[in-house]
């Protein structure tokens, strides 16, 4: 669990990043969850955008993905979400 200062620092880092993954008309699949989990392990911080063709709401998608990948939702802005999960390598110093 992150405290507010850590969340603020991670949000600041995420602001400068582009979306690493996109969710389209296929919505959330097992393959997408595995890809997101692998990305979280490699980068710890993942920005995901939801395309207009997706039939799932942004908040619902964020909660489903966070639950499936055991990650935390840092922020949801528009159709973009940012997820964080500490990796075994502990890449980011908070």
Task: Show where each model-derived region lies.
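Positively charged, polar, low-complexity stretches
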Residues: 1-94
């Amino acid at each position: 669990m992150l405290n507010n200062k850590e969340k603020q620092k991670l949000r600041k880092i995420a602001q400068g990043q582009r979306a690493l993954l996109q969710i389209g008309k296929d919505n959330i699949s097992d393959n997408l969850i595995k890809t997101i989990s692998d990305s979280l392990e490699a980068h710890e911080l993942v920005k995901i955008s939801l395309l207009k063709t997706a039939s799932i709401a942004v908040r619902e998608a964020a909660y489903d993905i966070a639950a499936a990948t055991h990650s935390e939702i840092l922020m949801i802005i528009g159709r973009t979400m940012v997820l964080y999960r500490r990796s075994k390598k502990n890449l980011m110093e908070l």
